[in-house]
């Protein structure tokens, strides 16, 4: 199916239901009672949000996975193996299947001829697009295979329990039938490959020694050689054909199972995001490789035994020696491969850390740049990379040994066998010697694939362990118990709940604001304290059992699972967070939840959503959820799709939701209205816009219970007021709403208020009841009134008109029309991923050579390779020379008779020949070791330099790059592409270079014996060139498509993990799983064809090499008596070696080029990424103590985020005096945050300039500028590491200074209670701190910097009013000497400012003192303030 432009009519392919009947037919899926019945076959002008993510990446969509199930059900009635057996028909003419591989007969299947039409298309076009590629066969679809694997895993769990369950056994059962078949085919390959040299070659060589010629007999021998080689080639191709399909099925199945599990997880804290991305990108690949190559290991022992028996027959007892060498090398190779795998396992852990840290850097790059912490993070990643490189180097040495050993084994085996054989006085003829060498050569195939097989199996073994640990992680259980009364929607009885320890290291510690410290002991009695201390494993087990009471009877685990889970849970350390919660929420009630920072508000709503573990009591819920998270989660899709969230488009409801959430003016600003791509995590939206979109999604979803976690914190006062009245009170009037907030003025209108403190509900009732109680709530509310009422009389009638006026001045609301929207370039924020075209340019190889050490290093490596292969070739030639010398015409006396001997043992120089032969072996081993070390160091230097340069360029890229590029795409460069360059490329390249030189030596040797052989090589060379031209384009283009389809697939995983709580709440797991399966199948389609294209080429190359061996055989026959039998033996042994080698080498050439596409992709970023200004500019550095005053001047400043976008700051001019405190207000999108962006030079000005203390900031380095500014951002950001590293990454401050900053932000006691104090762990995203605590730590961070200029971007939005007031006081005291710019949404935070700047549409419309602006009832600020103040003053 072709790409469809956004906004045009199309049929939604996902979730792929054709009717209500189809929908209910899908096993394991139940209809959401809230969702209306619908049919998805009519045209719609809207898009499913999950579809758009793919269209952003330029992907076509496969037909629905559910149609696969239907077709398979039809075929299942014909028998389990019906489809498999139908392949046995030699030729098939039917084309009922959509994928040609399913229509292939045996001949087409094993020679991969079904792929030829695609090869022709690619050759003609010169490139391959996604629409040219066949969708994945239904038999390979991830949905079909994952269901089967899941069933097998479930059976395993039920039989033996989670701890004893073996995922390896399950995987074996999944692949068993196909693997056994492939092993049978492999045995045929080995037998054919062995019988050719063993019998046919032996007779050919004996014929060369015979004096009489028999043309008919000799031609029959050549025909026999031809047939054995054809059988060997095609049966091997059939082995690969079976294995590749098995591998693709296994990869699709296990990755789908993994993602399905991720969607069910309570939280991902046991696994980092980096590890999960690696599991889904690299570990899936490992499973494929194990299925594809693992079975080839079975061929080794068979050939070794056959070879040993045959050699004994030919040579007698000494024949054991050669085979013994092979047999001893086999376990040695296994051991070395195991060592490689051991280092790979260690390396994977380092890679996980690096990818996780990279993900963190990319997610928060804006803040890293603002804090001027680029260097600190760069050093952190470099440190992890250095460790990874060290392990990679060790793994590389062992890997290099396994690659280089195979050709040497033949020589060692030959040297040992022949030396001992003749030393013991046995005869050795040319026929015997070269038959044995040829048999040894045929045995090397088994040895060559052994490192591949063992490496793939041992790496898959590591992957299986990682998958198993993921599959056994605890799942989230949405609460199934229903309250006793039908009018009650949520009921909690004496509930004590906990986060598991991996989720939080401090979540259970009391959160202390100064006021609380006094009441701490009074709040909780001794009885409760003792309950807190009773924290035993027994309770943890009880909790888990109790947790099962929340499930329906059909969801409760079996006794075996129960037992396994107890053990599993018993080992968890549960962190109590909520105590003795008693709560009943009636239907249709609006319940406000408030409390200080860290009091347990978010934990309470998480408990209702099933995210926590219930230790005591019970929870019951009746209804479906809509959830607005404290930090809004945005999909990488259009704004409309983010609101629809998979539901059908209803224009009336949609427009009504837009009005309720004040989104109309925003649509007018966006370039493509509501069809604008809003990027990953809402990259180009303000915090307020993201929050309102999240709220609009909840309103549109039309659920019965709404959980709103502080949804108005990032909004302007009048916008927040409008949304509270219009959206929450009016639209959700009949719904049950839990409304968490720090803005207490809204609680006046709630039906009920819950006040939380230290994990308990301490007060509960209506606003009036709590005020009469005169408890904590009343105290805080009174403080709010005292702190916020200004000295200005406000008339409520004036307020209404003022508010209206301010709305009118804004842009006219953009209406969402029903006509098709035209997709413009501007509307698409996220750029389609670039795809290389044509062959990989030579410049890419040159970049790699330069990175590896330059041309000289490359030359040294090539010389070492040539010496390596040359020493091997020399030893074989020396053997033939020795045989040709025979007895050296020496005369032997037997009794009284003398005669000329023909036996080599009688040669007087035998010792000399034998010594040189043995010496060649020693030289080979030494050269091999040197080459291994040099090559590994060279390739690792290349990959490390590429990594470092890429990382440097990414860190120095301007913000527009991160706004338009999904994190998954950049991460793909650092995970999948780096893995290719680190591990796969060196492995492939080493074998490729070695084999190319070996091929030239083979052809040279044969041509040396038969010059006429070169005549036959000519036509075959032309044929080979044509084949190479066609296949090279096919393989390269398919590899590029494989790379490109990987990015959206990774982006979807990242995005889904970040929004797990929202996906659970909306019960959208099934939709996200379908989307994932579509993206995975989109990736598997070119990936499967890429692997098949390799074999398509291999089969055809085999025919060329078979032609070469047949030509050699014919020349031996036709030139009978003209050449010595020793040289004939040399030629035929090399010809036999050439057959497998030739196709293997050309396949390696294509594969190595395909691997180089990863270097090309990395190099593309290195070459094309534009850089922001340098960190420091020589001779232009500002004075060390700059700025001393802190004066900020904007002169006609103009700024736009990207070319072709409208200006967001228009001719802005103003001067802020030193130490002045400025409040900046304005509607969302008015340009408030853009001022900060301009000041930090995150976006360079389009015109005008900014000066600080008279110095133009555009003239100095970015680090010089940013290190002198401090910011407390709207979105509090903590990085994984320690508390200390988050406050002071450069270790610039003393411990006392850090504790002082923590004390001033009221976090000292909280951090002091942690076991490791400042060295306590901070988890990814700071998830073990509440949002309010994170914000306090960000303020502490700013306090430490002692900067003259501070920007506060709504810094206290996530705090309760009391903490807010305390922090405001701290900020006023600490930054009294600083120039302060406060970007505010809650207007009371800026009333104490010296002046207030009002922005509208990127222009300064008002700039004066608060008293002047509030005394003018026609001012915008007056209107905005009136909207907020009326709420408190009138109703409070």
UniProtKB/Swiss-Prot annotation:
It is an enzyme of class 7 (translocase). Residues 501-511 have a biased composition (Polar residues). The modification Phosphoserine is found at residues 14, 19, 43, 60, 505, 509. GO terms for molecular function: ABC-type transporter activity; ABC-type xenobiotic transporter activity; ATP binding; ATP hydrolysis activity; carbohydrate derivative transmembrane transporter activity; efflux transmembrane transporter activity; glutathione transmembrane transporter activity; heme transmembrane transporter activity. Residues 514-529 have a biased composition (Basic residues). It is found in: Basolateral cell membrane; Golgi apparatus lumen; Endosome membrane; Cytoplasmic granule. Keywords: ATP-binding, Cell membrane, Endosome, Glycoprotein, Golgi apparatus, Membrane, Nucleotide-binding, Phosphoprotein, Repeat, Translocase, Transmembrane, Transmembrane helix, Transport. It holds the Pfam family ABC_tran. Residues 18-41, 545-559 have a biased composition (Basic and acidic residues). The chain crosses the membrane at residues 179-199, 219-239, 296-316, 317-337, 400-420, 426-446, 608-628, 847-867, 916-936, 996-1016, 1017-1037, 1101-1121, 1126-1146. It is a multi-pass membrane protein. One of its GO terms (biological process) is hyaluronan biosynthetic process. GO terms for cellular component: apical plasma membrane; basolateral plasma membrane; endosome membrane; Golgi lumen; membrane; plasma membrane. Glycans are attached at residues 494, 636, 684, 889, 896, 1043, 1328, 1416. SMART domains: AAA. Residues 1-41, 501-569, 798-822 are annotated as: Disordered. Disruption phenotype: Mrp5 knockout mice are viable with no overt phenotypes, deficient mice accumulate endogenous glutamate conjugates in several tissues, including the inhibitory neuropeptides N-acetylaspartylglutamate (NAAG) and N-acetylaspartyldiglutamate (NAAG2), but brain in particular. Abcc5-/- mice show lower white and brown adipose tissue and increased glucagon-like peptide 1 (GLP-1) release from enteroendocrine cells of the small intestine, and are more insulin sensitive. Its EC number is 7.6.2.-, 7.6.2.2. Residues 179-459, 858-1154 form the ABC transmembrane type-1 domain. It catalyses: ATP + H2O + xenobioticSide 1 = ADP + phosphate + xenobioticSide 2; 3',5'-cyclic GMP(in) + ATP + H2O = 3',5'-cyclic GMP(out) + ADP + phosphate + H(+); 3',5'-cyclic AMP(in) + ATP + H2O = 3',5'-cyclic AMP(out) + ADP + phosphate + H(+); N-acetyl-L-aspartyl-L-glutamate(in) + ATP + H2O = N-acetyl-L-aspartyl-L-glutamate(out) + ADP + phosphate + H(+). InterPro entries: AAA+_ATPase, ABC1_TM_dom, ABC1_TM_sf, ABC_transporter-like_ATP-bd, ABC_transporter-like_CS, ABC_transporter_C-like, P-loop_NTPase. ATP 1 binds at residues 595-602. ATP-dependent transporter of the ATP-binding cassette (ABC) family that actively extrudes physiological compounds, and xenobiotics from cells. Mediates ATP-dependent transport of endogenous metabolites like cyclic nucleotides, such as cAMP and cGMP, folic acid and N-lactoyl-amino acids (in vitro). Acts also as a general glutamate conjugate and analog transporter that can limit the brain levels of endogenous metabolites, drugs, and toxins. Confers resistance to the antiviral agent PMEA. Belongs to the ABC transporter superfamily. ABCC family. Conjugate transporter (TC 3.A.1.208) subfamily. PANTHER family: ATP-BINDING CASSETTE SUB-FAMILY C, ATP-BINDING CASSETTE SUB-FAMILY C MEMBER 5. This is ATP-binding cassette sub-family C member 5. The lineage of its organism: Eukaryota, Metazoa, Chordata, Craniata, Vertebrata.
């Amino acid at each position: 199916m072709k790409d469809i432009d956004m906004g045009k009519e199309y049929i939604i392919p996902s979730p792929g239901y054709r009717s209500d009947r189809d929908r209910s037919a899908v096993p394991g899926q139940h209809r959401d009672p809230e969702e209306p019945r619908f049919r998805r076959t009519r045209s719609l002008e809207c898009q499913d949000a999950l579809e758009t993510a793919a269209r952003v990446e330029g992907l076509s969509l496969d037909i629905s996975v559910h149609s696969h199930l239907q077709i398979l059900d039809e075929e299942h009635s014909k028998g389990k193996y019906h489809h498999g057996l139908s392949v046995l028909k030699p030729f098939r003419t039917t084309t009922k299947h959509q994928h040609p591989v399913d229509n292939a007969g045996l001949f087409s299947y094993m020679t991969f001829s079904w792929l030829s039409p695609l090869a022709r298309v690619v050759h003609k076009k010169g490139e391959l697009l996604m629409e040219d590629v066949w969708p994945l066969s239904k038999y390979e679809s991830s949905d079909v295979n994952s269901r089967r694997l899941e069933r097998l895993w479930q059976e395993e769990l039920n039989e033996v329990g989670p701890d004893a369950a073996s995922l390896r056994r399950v995987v074996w059962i999944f692949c068993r039938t196909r693997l056994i078949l492939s092993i049978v085919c492999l045995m045929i390959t080995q037998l054919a490959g062995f019988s050719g040299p063993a019998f046919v070659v032996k007779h050919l060589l004996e014929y060369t020694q015979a004096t009489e010629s028999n043309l008919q007999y000799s031609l029959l021998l050549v025909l026999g050689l031809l047939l054995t080689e054809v059988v060997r080639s095609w049966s091997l191709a059939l082995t690969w054909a079976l294995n590749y399909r098995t591998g693709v099925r296994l990869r699709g199945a296990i990755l789908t199972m993994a993602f399905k599990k991720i969607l069910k997880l309570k939280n991902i804290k046991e696994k980092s995001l980096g590890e999960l991305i690696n599991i889904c990108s690299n570990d899936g690949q490992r499973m494929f490789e194990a299925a594809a190559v693992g079975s080839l290991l079975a061929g080794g022992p068979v050939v070794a035994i056959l070879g040993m028996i045959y050699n004994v027959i030919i040579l007698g007892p000494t024949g054991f020696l050669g085979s013994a060498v092979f047999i001893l090398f086999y376990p040695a190779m296994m051991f070395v491969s195991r060592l490689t795998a051991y280092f790979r396992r260690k390396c994977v852990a380092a890679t996980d850390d690096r990818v996780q840290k990279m993900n963190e850097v990319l997610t928060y790059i804006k803040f890293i740049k603002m804090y001027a912490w680029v260097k600190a993070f760069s050093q952190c990643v470099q440190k992890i990379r250095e460790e990874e490189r060290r392990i990679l180097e060790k793994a590389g040495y062992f890997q290099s040994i396994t690659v280089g050993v195979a050709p040497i084994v033949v020589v060692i085996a030959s040297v040992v066998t022949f030396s001992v054989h003749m030393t013991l006085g046995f005869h050795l003829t040319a026929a015997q010697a070269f038959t044995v060498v040829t048999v040894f050569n045929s045995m090397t195939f088994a040895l060559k694939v052994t490192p591949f097989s063992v490496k793939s199996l041992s790496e898959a073994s590591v992957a299986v362990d990682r998958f198993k640990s993921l599959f056994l992680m605890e799942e989230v259980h949405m609460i199934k118990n229903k309250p006793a009364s039908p009018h009650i929607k949520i009921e909690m009885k004496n509930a004590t709940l906990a986060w598991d320890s991996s989720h939080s290291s401090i979540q259970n510690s009391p959160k202390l604001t100064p006021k609380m410290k006094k009441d701490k002991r009074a709040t909780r009695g001794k009885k409760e304290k003792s309950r807190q201390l009773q924290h035993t494993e027994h309770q943890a087990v009880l909790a888990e059992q109790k947790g099962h009471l929340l499930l329906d009877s059909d969801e409760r685990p079996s006794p075996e699972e129960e037992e396994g889970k107890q053990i599993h849970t018993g080992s968890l350390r549960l962190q109590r967070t909520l105590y003795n919660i008693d709560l009943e929420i009636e239907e249709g009630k609006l319940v406000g939840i408030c409390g200080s920072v860290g009091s347990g508000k978010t934990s309470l709503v998480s408990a209702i959503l099933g995210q926590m573990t219930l230790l005591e009591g019970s929870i019951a819920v009746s209804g479906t959820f809509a959830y607005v998270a404290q930090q809004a989660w945005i999909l990488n899709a259009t704004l409309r799709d983010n609101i629809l969230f998979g539901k059908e488009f209803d224009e009336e409801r949609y427009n009504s939701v837009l009005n309720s959430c004040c989104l109309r003016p925003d649509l007018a600003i966006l370039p493509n209205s509501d069809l604008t791509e809003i990027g990953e995590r809402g990259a180009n939206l303000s915090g307020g816009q993201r929050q309102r979109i999240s709220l609009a999604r909840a309103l549109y979803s039309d659920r019965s219970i709404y959980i709103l976690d502080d949804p108005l914190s990032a909004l302007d006062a009048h916008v927040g007021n409008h949304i509270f009245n219009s959206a929450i009170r009016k639209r959700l009037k009949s719904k049950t709403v839990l409304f968490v907030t720090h803005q207490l003025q809204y609680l006046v209108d709630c039906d009920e208020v819950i006040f939380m403190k230290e994990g308990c509900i301490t007060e509960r009732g209506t606003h009036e009841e709590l005020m009469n109680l005169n408890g904590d709530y009343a105290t805080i509310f009174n403080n709010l009134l005292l702190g916020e009422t200004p000295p200005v009389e406000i008339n409520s009638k004036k307020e209404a008109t003022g508010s209206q006026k301010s709305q009118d001045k804004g842009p006219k609301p953009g209406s969402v029309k029903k006509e098709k929207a035209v997709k413009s370039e501007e509307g698409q924020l996220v750029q389609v991923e670039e795809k290389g075209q044509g062959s990989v340019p030579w410049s890419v190889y040159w970049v790699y050579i330069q990175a590896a050490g330059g041309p000289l290093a490359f030359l040294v490596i090539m010389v070492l390779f040539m010496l390596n292969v040359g020493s091997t070739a020399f030893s074989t030639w020396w053997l033939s020379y020795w045989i040709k010398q025979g007895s050296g015409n020496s005369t032997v006396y037997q009794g009284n008779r003398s005669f000329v001997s023909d036996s080599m043992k009688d040669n007087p120089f035998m010792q000399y020949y034998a010594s040189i032969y043995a010496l060649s072996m020693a030289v080979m081993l030494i050269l091999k070791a040197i080459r291994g070390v040099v090559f590994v160091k060279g390739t690792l230097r290349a990959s490390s330099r590429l990594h470092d340069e890429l990382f440097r360029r990414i860190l120095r890229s301007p913000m527009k790059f991160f706004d338009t590029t999904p994190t998954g795409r950049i991460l793909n460069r650092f995970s999948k592409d780096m893995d290719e360059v680190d591990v796969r490329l060196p492995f492939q390249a080493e074998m490729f270079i070695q084999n190319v030189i070996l091929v030239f030596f083979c052809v040279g040797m044969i041509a040396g014996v038969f010059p006429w052989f070169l005549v036959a090589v000519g036509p075959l060379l032309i044929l080979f060139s044509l084949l190479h031209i066609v296949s090279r384009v096919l393989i390269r283009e398919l590899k590029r498509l494989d790379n490109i389809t990987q990015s959206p697939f990774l982006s979807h995983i990242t995005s889904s993990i970040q929004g797990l709580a929202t996906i659970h709440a909306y019960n959208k797991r099934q939709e996200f799983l379908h989307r994932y399966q579509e993206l995975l199948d989109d990736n598997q389609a070119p990936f499967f064809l890429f692997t098949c294209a390799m074999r398509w080429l291999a089969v055809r190359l085999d025919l060329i090499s078979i032609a070469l061996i047949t030509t050699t055989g014919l020349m031996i026959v036709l030139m009978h008596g003209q050449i010595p039998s020793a040289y004939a033996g040399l030629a035929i042994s090399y010809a036999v070696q050439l057959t497998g080698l030739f196709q293997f080498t050309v396949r390696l050439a294509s594969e190595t080029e395909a691997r180089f596409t990863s270097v090309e992709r990395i190099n593309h970023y290195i070459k094309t990424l534009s850089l922001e200004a340098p960190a420091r500019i020589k001779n232009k550095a500002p004075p060390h103590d700059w700025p001393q005053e802190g004066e900020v001047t904007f002169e006609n400043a103009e700024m736009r985020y990207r070319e072709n976008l409208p200006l967001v700051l228009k001719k802005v001019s103003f001067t802020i005096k030193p130490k002045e405190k400025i409040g900046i207000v304005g509607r969302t999108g008015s340009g408030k945050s853009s001022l900060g962006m301009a000041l930090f030079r995150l976006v360079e000005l389009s015109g005008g300039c900014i000066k600080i203390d008279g110095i133009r900031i555009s003239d100095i380095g970015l680090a010089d500028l940013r290190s002198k500014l401090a910011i407390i951002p709207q979105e509090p950001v903590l990085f994984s590491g320690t508390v200390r590293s988050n406050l002071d990454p450069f270790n610039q401050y003393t411990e006392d200074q850090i504790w002082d900053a923590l004390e001033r932000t009221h976090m000292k006691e909280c951090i002091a209670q942690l076991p490791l104090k400042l060295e306590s762990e901070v988890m990814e995203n700071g998830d073990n701190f509440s949002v309010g605590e994170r914000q306090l730590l960000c303020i502490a961070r700013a306090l430490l910097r002692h900067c003259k200029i501070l920007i506060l971007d709504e810094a206290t939005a996530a705090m309760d009013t009391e903490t807010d007031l305390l922090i405001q006081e701290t900020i006023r005291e600490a930054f009294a000497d600083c120039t302060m710019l406060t970007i505010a949404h809650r207007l009371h935070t800026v009333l104490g400012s010296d002046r207030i700047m009002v922005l509208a549409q990127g222009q300064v419309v008002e700039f004066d003192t608060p008293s002047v602006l509030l005394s003018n009832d026609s001012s915008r600020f007056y209107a905005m303030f009136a909207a907020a103040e009326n709420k408190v003053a009138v109703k409070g």
